[in-house]
Amino acid sequence: MKSSIVAKLEALQERHEEVLAHLGDANVIADQDRFRALSREYAQLTDVTRCFKEWRSVQDDIEAAEMMLDDPEMREMAQDELKEAKARSEELEQQLQVLLLPKDPDDERDCFLEIRAGTGGDEAAIFAGDMFRMYSRYAEARRWKVEIMSASEGEHGGYKEVIAKVSGDGVFGQLKFESGGHRVQRVPETESQGRIHTSACTVAVMPAIPEAEMPEINAGDLRIDTFRSSGAGGQHVNTTDSAIRITHIPTGIVVECQDERSQHKNKAKAMSVLGARIRAAEMQKRQQAEASERRNLLGSGDRSDRNRTYNFPQGRVTDHRINLTLYRLDEVMEGKLDMLIQPIVQEYQADQLSALSEQD
């Protein structure tokens, strides 16, 4: 391993010990904000420190095995130990390189998940509903919380549009690669001839950001309309103008929220989604500029980004970004998404490593 990387790892190990000492300080414990920030830093440093300690231990094993090679009686055993230790050393070096990759500060945040029906009419709305159920199952398995912020239901089931907030550990980091176009090929329930139809929906995943980090939104740039909510809501439906539609005039971004019975709560929810959308649009512009010379696995949430095709007659799902095809569609639709998400994450990390090595 390069001496510059070893030096960086030694510095991180020292910082890990420093942070641990700070966490035992009574003054730090009394300051909850500082204590939380240091606790997060300690957790982030723990994996890389543990891996580095094991790597160092393996280097000692390699050295000991090499010394035993001079002893004829021990040579055969030493050769086996040396082979095993060198293989483990390579594994740990790869792990350390990944652990040293620049972290996206948004990865640990909650996120807003938006699913919109695209081409395909009623079938597209039904598919959007299936997608929302798939993500909800995935979230449930990871003990994340899913809260619907706004929903416009399809006439024959599913959703024309649904926006949900997903809360939990590392939510955005896991779901961010879902942004883009998703296509379904199947025979719709309404199809009497048994013909396969192609429908689509778009998914957008944005980090949920605290109020303090919200982009500055000028009240004069907003048009706020109220209207009567439709759909679920019991006796309050169509009796009060509690639903809110906010239009951000400079960008044309429109957010509707009608899930709550209180207009004030709907407005607060809509503003949080609007802030996240504006920030996501700004971040996307920056990412496009940075990634203009290399492929970008992070979709924009635009229908032109073709992420996956879900082919029901063949029980097949294909991720077009990395040419991955799995014949496990039933499991995927039940929320077992790690088999699709992890290969994308690994490919993204490989691209990052490649970019770093080019800089070196």
UniProtKB/Swiss-Prot annotation:
Q: List the GO molecular function terms.
A: translation release factor activity, codon specific
Q: Where is it found, in Gene Ontology cellular component terms?
A: cytoplasm
Q: Which residues carry this modification: N5-methylglutamine?
A: 235
Q: Which UniProt keywords are given for this protein, alphabetically ordered?
A: Cytoplasm, Methylation, Protein biosynthesis
Give one Pfam family, short name only.
RF-1
Cross-referenced InterPro entries, in alphabetical order? PCRF (IPR005139), Pep_chain_release_fac_I (IPR000352), Pep_chain_release_fac_I_sf (IPR045853), Prokaryotic/Mito_RF (IPR050057), RF-1 (IPR004373)
Q: Extract the ranges annotated as region (Disordered).
A: 283-313
Report what the Swiss-Prot or TrEMBL entry states about this protein's PTMs: Methylated by PrmC. Methylation increases the termination efficiency of RF1.
Where does the chain cross the membrane?
A: none
SUPFAM superfamilies the record matches: Release factor
Give its localization. Answer: Cytoplasm
Q: Where is the composition biased (Basic and acidic residues)?
A: 283-308
NCBIfam families (alphabetical): prfA, PRK00591.1
**Protein function:** Peptide chain release factor 1 directs the termination of translation in response to the peptide chain termination codons UAG and UAA.
Similarity remark: Belongs to the prokaryotic/mitochondrial release factor family.
This protein is called Peptide chain release factor 1
